[in-house]
Amino acid sequence: MTLEELVACDNAAQKMQTVTAAVEELLVAAQRQDRLTVGVYESAKLMNVDPDSVVLCLLAIDEEEEDDIALQIHFTLIQSFCCDNDINIVRVSGMQRLAQLLGEPAETQGTTEARDLHCLLVTNPHTDAWKSHGLVEVASYCEESRGNNQWVPYISLQER
């Protein structure tokens, strides 16, 4: 490996860490400010009613769920809708970390039904211009990825 290749790999890894941290920060802030829609069905309803308020769509799935055909069909339809409406999309793995970030109860309790975390929408109502460093960082990453012909960039949330 040449020095240039090593530097490029290091920069890519650092960029991925920055974007992952930005997504985590954005999700926590969006939930705190009631700007987060959780669930495939709820997200589809919101995008049908007010697609202009959606600024980011996160599609979350872990490797063991990749064979879920129904979920993949939902993702395909949501991705298509997002592309038609210029909504940034990011694929995310690490459902356990996602649940942890959103304060979901642990699976071991079993008494409460867990929310569907496979699709998350971050909204920005028309009435105010909410600016979040995390949102700017993620939007920049999405734009950069599209420039590299990666239409739906991927990040992995790591457990802590």
Swiss-Prot record:
GO cellular component: cytoplasm; nucleus
Entry keywords, A to Z: Apoptosis, Developmental protein, Differentiation
GO biological process, one term: positive regulation of JNK cascade
Pfam families named among the record's database cross-references: Ribosomal_L7Ae (PF01248)
Similarity field: Belongs to the GADD45 family.
PANTHER family: GROWTH ARREST AND DNA DAMAGE-INDUCIBLE PROTEIN GADD45 (PTHR10411), GROWTH ARREST AND DNA DAMAGE-INDUCIBLE PROTEIN GADD45 BETA (PTHR10411:SF5)
Function noted in UniProt: Involved in the regulation of growth and apoptosis. Mediates activation of stress-responsive MTK1/MEKK4 MAPKKK.
The name this protein goes by in its record: Growth arrest and DNA damage-inducible protein GADD45 beta
Organism: Homo sapiens (Human)
